[in-house]
Amino acid sequence: MAAEKQVPGGGGGGGSGGGGGSGGGGSGGGRGAGGEENKENERPSAGSKANKEFGDSLSLEILQIIKESQQQHGLRHGDFQRYRGYCSRRQRRLRKTLNFKMGNRHKFTGKKVTEELLTDNRYLLLVLMDAERAWSYAMQLKQEANTEPRKRFHLLSRLRKAVKHAEELERLCESNRVDAKTKLEAQAYTAYLSGMLRFEHQEWKAAIEAFNKCKTIYEKLASAFTEEQAVLYNQRVEEISPNIRYCAYNIGDQSAINELMQMRLRSGGTEGLLAEKLEALITQTRAKQAATMSEVEWRGRTVPVKIDKVRIFLLGLADNEAAIVQAESEETKERLFESMLSECRDAIQVVREELKPDQKQRDYILEGEPGKVSNLQYLHSYLTYIKLSTAIKRNENMAKGLQRALLQQQPEDDSKRSPRPQDLIRLYDIILQNLVELLQLPGLEEDKAFQKEIGLKTLVFKAYRCFFIAQSYVLVKKWSEALVLYDRVLKYANEVNSDAGAFKNSLKDLPDVQELITQVRSEKCSLQAAAILDANDAHQTETSSSQVKDNKPLVERFETFCLDPSLVTKQANLVHFPPGFQPIPCKPLFFDLALNHVAFPPLEDKLEQKTKSGLTGYIKGIFGFRS
């Protein structure tokens, strides 16, 4: 219980007292989203329409409430901790709204929702939030239990707590004040959580009984209401169907494995408790079959397979390839490709470790048989061939998706970059690199048919790579370069057509070269027309620019008319500004040439008088006695 207090944003203790214990922490974390959550608690939460149908009885849309809350508060991204914090905050607000607090900050007073309190359906919602909070904590611990096995015990404890709250909700709904639909939903909810708990305990019989009960109730509810209301119930039935089949298989129904394999191919695959268990089940089934597998034949040579992990991978190879072909969505295909490549890499690593100890096998060449490698090395080459071929198929599938996106002229979206031919060029570069690695596999150097087959595949992908390089040149109007590349595409494609007679079966899965030839021919015609139009446009632009772009402002060419679009822009060339410099007459300069020839009157008499006055005159001048 104490661990639940670690939830950021408010998580209280376990049990019915969780809402009161989350008071301090919950208010801080819930203020951001508190507006909507407060509105949920100020009115009866869901079931108002049902109240009218069943008179004054209480109604609660249990499945609808939990699905909407989960989608809006973290479970869309698998964030169980966020959803758990939301449940704690909503509990606290419900208790505050209903005045059903668990004491105060100084003293805890435990309270339970009883049948006498059922005057408002929010009391039922309070118990539902208790169960949801415990369930979300269990799912959070399940994510962490992969790295910390000790947390599995805590996970089971939280699931038991969730079942306890669900049973309490079911008991309250048995009251005459609650309508029949809510009673059925409470029973289905309890059966669902109980089934999950039994599933974790590997009590398959009890789990399948609980899941079947849940499925039956939801199917009955779906058939009793309109199609819009039945969508949620049908979704829940689809969610628990894989769990039912898994339990049936563990009880002894061997036919269930085929249905589980088909469920894995559906969009999104399986989720929750079943995802990891289903992968483990498939591996376990293949391991049982691997005991009968002792050898594998590839390109006319049979080699023994003694490594169990390699046997399991080779047994599932055909199933994996069929699953990729049958996949409904691109996301599922990509997930299956990645899973297959991961298994193949693991098998190659095991074989590589077996090759290290034996020095003779590290030399790869058997004495007396040049060009022939050991069985273990040949098996390594076979697994590498599978890995590279799968990588080529995955990249080819991605290239097809990008080609479809290029053909669909979608509006520009700033948030998402539209695909470009350069993206396809990169994919085909990777494919060609994988083909080069295939040619270098040990043990296949003398296989002329294999070398020829890979050479033809290389020509096919080179043709497509050249085609998209030409497309990228067309986008930047480099017509001559694009035309040369189109001719190169036709050259590669014609070589494939001339040499593909004996390899049609191996090339049937590759892109159609004849279709590429037709497309290139049409593109060449379009390119030549576009080049001619572009040349005419360039000539007209040069002619008009020679008439207009002569650096003359409008004020100097009033006498000639030219359509100049720049005149209506902010950089219109109307006048020279600032004006240019022009020569003007300067101010005349006068020189006094007669000054040197003028004789001025003598001043000696005045200078003598000033000299005679001396000190006496100076003193008189100071005191003002000078006349």
From Swiss-Prot:
Q: Does the keyword Acetylation apply?
A: yes
**Alphabetically, which GO biological process terms does the record hold?**
response to xenobiotic stimulus; SRP-dependent cotranslational protein targeting to membrane
Annotated stretches, region: Required for interaction with SRP72: 588-610
Domain of life per record: Eukaryota
Q: Region entry Disordered: which residue ranges?
A: 1-53
Answer whether the UniProt record assigns the keyword ATP-binding to this protein: no
Please list the residues that carry the modification Phosphoserine.
Answer: 48, 241
Residues that the record marks as modified (N6-acetyllysine) are: 452
Spell out the family assignment given in the record's similarity comment: Belongs to the SRP68 family.
Per the UniProt record, the associated disease is: Neutropenia, severe congenital, 10, autosomal recessive: A form of severe congenital neutropenia, a disorder of hematopoiesis characterized by maturation arrest of granulopoiesis at the level of promyelocytes with peripheral blood absolute neutrophil counts below 0.5 x 10(9)/l, and early onset of severe bacterial infections. SCN10 is characterized by infantile onset of neutropenia. Anemia and thrombocytopenia may be transiently present.
Q: What does this protein do?
A: Component of the signal recognition particle (SRP) complex, a ribonucleoprotein complex that mediates the cotranslational targeting of secretory and membrane proteins to the endoplasmic reticulum (ER). The SRP complex interacts with the signal sequence in nascent secretory and membrane proteins and directs them to the membrane of the ER. The SRP complex targets the ribosome-nascent chain complex to the SRP receptor (SR), which is anchored in the ER, where SR compaction and GTPase rearrangement drive cotranslational protein translocation into the ER.
Record-given protein name: Signal recognition particle subunit SRP68
This chain's source organism reads: Homo sapiens
